[in-house]
Every structure is written in C-alpha cells, then in structure tokens.
UniProtKB/Swiss-Prot annotation:
GO molecular function, one term: small ribosomal subunit rRNA binding
Domain of life: Bacteria
InterPro entries: Ribosomal_bS6, Ribosomal_bS6_sf, Ribosomal_S6_plastid/chlpt, Transl_elong_EF1B/ribsomal_bS6
Role: Binds together with bS18 to 16S ribosomal RNA.
Keywords from the named record: Ribonucleoprotein, Ribosomal protein, RNA-binding, rRNA-binding
Organism for this UniProt entry: Dehalococcoides mccartyi (strain ATCC BAA-2266 / KCTC 15142 / 195) (Dehalococcoides ethenogenes (strain 195))
Protein name: Small ribosomal subunit protein bS6
Gene Ontology biological process terms in this record: translation
Keyword RNA-binding: yes
Pfam short name (any one): Ribosomal_S6
C-alpha cells in the first residue's frame, strides 16, 4: 500500500474523541439540546455517533472568560472522523452561547 493511500485510509477512519463544551449559564435548555443535536447530526453525516453524554451542570470557572465566571458544562464521548471534528469546532467557535470548547482525540498515544 502506498504511503498516500495509508494516510488517506487512516484519516477517514472513525476515532474516539472527548468533547467538553462550556455554555453560558443563561442558555435555555432547548438551545443546549439544539447545540447537541447539531453536533450529533454533523458526526452522523460521516457515520459517527455519541457513545456518552453527561451534563455536568453549572460550575464555577477557574478564571473569568470574557464576562463569565460560571458556565454550564457538557461532556461528550463520541466516535467521529477528523473532518467532522473540524466542522464541529468551526460551528462551536461561532456560537454565541459557547464560552469555550475542546475536543481531544483519545486514540493518540
């Protein structure tokens, strides 16, 4: 197998990711669910899925982020392709309700 074929096959494989999203505390529950549904649809388009979703709830931030001292935390474990993660990051970056987010690839050693 050529190196380029190997790289392409590795890039397109599903990988395990953990995603933490911190939302503003005044975000309505319906909007939280809409954001999670949007993430789910994005990864489902490329055969991915959530394996676990935990609402950690309202917590104090370690430091102020903008004007926010508290945030509503959501922790997600999922199987997704890297291209899905790039789209999720772009979507979350422009959302007004998202204070901060981070996706981590759990497959890397």
């Amino acid at each position: 197998m050529a190196a380029s074929e190997l790289l392409k096959s590795r890039v397109e494989n599903l990988r395990d990711y953990e995603l933490v999203v911190i939302l503003t505390t005044d975000t309505p529950k319906e909007k939280v669910e809409a954001i999670l549904e949007g993430i789910s649809k994005t990864i489902a388009e490329k055969d991915g899925s959530f394996t676990e979703v935990n609402h950690w709830g309202k917590r104090k931030l370690a430091y102020l982020i903008g004007r926010y001292g508290e945030g509503y935390y959501v922790f997600i474990k999922m199987k997704a392709k890297p291209s899905s993660i790039r789209k999720i990051n772009a979507d979350l970056r422009i959302s007004e309700q998202v204070i901060r987010h981070m996706a981590i690839n759990m497959d890397e050693e």
